Amino acid sequence: QFDALKAWSKAGTKNNTQLWMQISHAGRQTPGEINSSPMAPSAIGLKIPGKNFGTPTPMTEEDMLDVIDRFVFTAKIARDTGFTGVQFHSAHGYLLSEFLSPDINNRTDAWGGSIENRARIHLEIIKRCRQEVGEDFPISVKLNSADFQKGGFSPDESIKVAQMLENAGVDIIEISGGTYEQPKLIGVEASINAKRSEKRKESTIAREAYFLEYAQD
């Protein structure tokens, strides 16, 4: 599919247009019809009425290294086929953001616990990616400003991770928020699991400026 990706990037970068490849792994949010036992940091599954999500299998050290290799390999393919840059998806409850959430990641090894440990997989990916694609190929990360869930990834932790990513060589950080359990950002009433959701400020809702406070910080 190398030639197909080249044709795609050629079409997408005409007239000085940029075309970035977003790279992601669904983790525990993989539909059960696709994988009834998906990989995740811990065996904490989603409970969404009417949806089929399997109980996750906690990742081994070998799994972690394999996922890192796959993210880096895909980034190299993006560069070699002419994409402008890559974005690693670490928001909305996908695998990388699952590592950041203390509500989902209850590991007691070097990949869990402190925010430094929970962000480790990100930093390893960025480090390896830089070695493979060089300094002149842009790298972005899509990062939750918060999960908007009790006990989840907080704005204060997100700011710390953003600083880590910048220091690691990330060029652009796109801010987002929420997970499958809290898919909308306008308040508890929009949540699938309201008991675990945090209320958004009314002033923020009125402006539809969901990440304004985070950006100001």
Please give the residue ranges for each predicted region.
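Flavin-dependent oxidoreductase catalytic cores
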Residues: 1-217
